[in-house]
Amino acid sequence: MADIQIVKRDGRRQSYDNKKVAAVVARAAAGFELDVSPLLDAVNNYVKEGIGSQEVMNFLILTALNLTSVENPDWKNVAGRLKLFDLYKKTALARNCNHCYDRLYDYPVFLQQMWADGCYDREWQAKYSAEELAEAGTFIKPAYDLVYDYAGINLLIKRYLCE
């Protein structure tokens, strides 16, 4: 594949890396018995000079949905995971930590940011100790996110995240 430049969400240009896309697709398809080559072939044929990385992700999600069938229902789960990864990326960017996906569920750090941004009332700081807030963070199980299929994650985003 010739060197194709894509536009990242922050406006930077970068060479399209089909191995990086394949790794994302493999992570989304983990645990399912699916041949991911139709999805990878489709996206590699779709990518063109100057395309945005968000458009590439949208194409991956829609193509995974289109691959869903009676014979291959797990593609709806792959589409859901891809949508979830997109949400993680948007969340990381909104929190000014482009590559901090491992910290998205760091509840005390999240609360500090929400207090600093004025989104949450600082009254919580007086009512709960740092240890209690850290304990509350342990109740969140990121692995449960991977259970959502496309319809589930889409509903969650539209209903509860006001997208």
Regions found by a protein language model. Give the residues of each.
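Extended catalytic cores of very large enzyme megasubunits
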Residues: M1-E163
